[in-house]
Swiss-Prot record:
Ranges of biased composition (kind: Polar residues): 45-57
GO cellular component: host cell cytoplasm
UniProt GO MF annotations: ATP hydrolysis activity; magnesium ion binding; nucleotide binding; RNA binding
Presence of the UniProt keyword Glycoprotein in the record: yes
UniProt key word Lipid metabolism: no
GO biological process: viral genome replication
Family matches, as InterPro entries: Rotavirus_A/C_NSP5, Rotavirus_B_NSP5
Pfam families on file: GBR_NSP5
UniProt family annotation: Belongs to the rotavirus NSP5 family.
Region (Disordered): 1-67, 83-106
Function: Plays an essential role in the viral genome replication. Participates, together with NSP2, in the formation of viral factories (viroplasms) which are large inclusions in the host cytoplasm where replication intermediates are assembled and viral RNA replication takes place. Orchestrates the recruitment of viroplasmic proteins such as capsid proteins to these factories.
Protein name according to UniProt: Non-structural protein 5
Length: 170
């Protein structure tokens, strides 16, 4: 009986390995068929890929040829006339260029005057701080400053302060 069970076991193992081999071969055949289908699709789309590449390269060449213009959006869109259908570009006149230049110059002047005024106010503030630092400290101001900072003093500093106040009273 033991020999019979061993024999059956090897037969079952062979059957399993054979079925595994068959499934592997089936999947390989399916993959090969899928690859051939993909190749057919690729060959059909070669023209579209080439045309898209050429379109990209043409667009890139156009971008390289366009001059780089640094304009603000306001100046750029001022020259466009909007209609119901589309944007129509109209050439800007020399008068508008002159007015634009004048407006830009005034704007620059305003910016420079604003920055100058800002710097002046900062300098005035610094001068006031320096004046306050250099003022002679009166006894009342020193006393008030000490009382404000008493909490920050250590115990020994507080004792020394009290001794100094008592000695100054004598």
């Amino acid at each position: 009986m033991a020999e019979a069970s061993e024999f059956n076991f090897t037969i079952k193992r062979k059957q399993r390995t054979m079925s595994d081999r068959r499934t592997r071969e089936d999947t390989k055949q399916k993959k090969i068929e899928e690859k051939s289908d993909i190749d057919l699709v690729d060959s059909a789309s070669v023209y579209s890929q080439e045309s898209s590449r050429s379109n990209y390269s043409d667009a890139y060449d156009k971008l390289k040829r366009e001059p780089m213009v640094e304009e603000s959006n306001d100046a750029k869109y001022r020259n466009f006339e909007f209609s119901e259908d589309e944007e129509v570009h109209r050439p800007s006149s020399k008068a508008s260029d002159k007015s634009y230049r004048e407006m830009k110059r005034k704007h620059d002047d305003i910016n420079t005057s604003d920055s100058i005024l800002e710097k002046l106010s900062e300098l005035n503030l610094e001068i006031e701080k320096i004046k306050q630092m250099n003022q002679p400290i009166t006894i009342d101001a020193a006393f008030n400053m000490i009382l404000r900072n008493v909490d920050n003093l250590t115990i020994r500093q507080k004792q020394a302060l009290i001794n100094a106040i008592v000695n100054s009273m004598n």
